[in-house]
């Protein structure tokens, strides 16, 4: 318990309007689902540099509340594996709570799920802007990669924060651990 208290764990979240490595991530996932993905030399460094240098749109930084003594004491009362899981879960909740959802996230969620669930969060111009951006990004990938698989993963990259926030709300409402 004392060790965790000494750490003074303060969860943070950074939310980007535009994921700078969206198409690289989608491409890698599509390839890795078909066969073992082998990164080219320097690919990791290139991804890091893209993540730093590429456009991100608006950025939201949230510095969460530190883990409480009660949360740490609760975790400390568990066996070693459960202790770390409880701490991880408490940190995850704070990170997700602090995550800002952007219009792109809601647009992608609705497109991916063929719904209008979050249509009050954006307008038609936002949809057109996101779809145009997505199609442009998809056009940068070699044509032999399945475009529909690529599109689905691309949409999921932007939609998943909405799904995660929904799970957080369900978890708060039910008390069941979903995350």
Which role does the model predict for each range below?
Residues 1-179:
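Membrane-interfacial terminal anchoring regions of lipid-handling membrane enzymes
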């Amino acid at each position: 318990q004392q060790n965790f208290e000494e750490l003074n764990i303060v969860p943070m979240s950074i939310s980007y309007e535009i994921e700078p490595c969206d198409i690289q991530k989608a491409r890698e996932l599509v390839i890795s689902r078909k066969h073992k993905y082998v990164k080219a030399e320097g690919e990791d460094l290139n991804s890091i540099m893209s993540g730093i240098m590429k456009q991100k749109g608006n950025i939201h930084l949230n510095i969460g509340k530190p883990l409480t003594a009660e949360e740490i004491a609760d975790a400390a009362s568990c066996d070693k594996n459960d202790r770390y899981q409880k701490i991880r879960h408490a940190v995850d909740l704070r990170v997700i709570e602090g995550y800002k959802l952007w219009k792109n996230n809601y647009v992608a969620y609705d497109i991916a799920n063929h719904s209008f669930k979050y249509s009050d969060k954006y307008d038609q111009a936002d949809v057109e802007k996101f779809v145009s951006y997505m199609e442009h990004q998809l056009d940068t990938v070699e044509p032999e990669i399945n475009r529909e698989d690529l599109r689905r993963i691309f949409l999921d990259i932007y939609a998943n924060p909405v799904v995660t926030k929904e799970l957080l709300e369900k978890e708060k409402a039910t008390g069941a651990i979903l995350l």
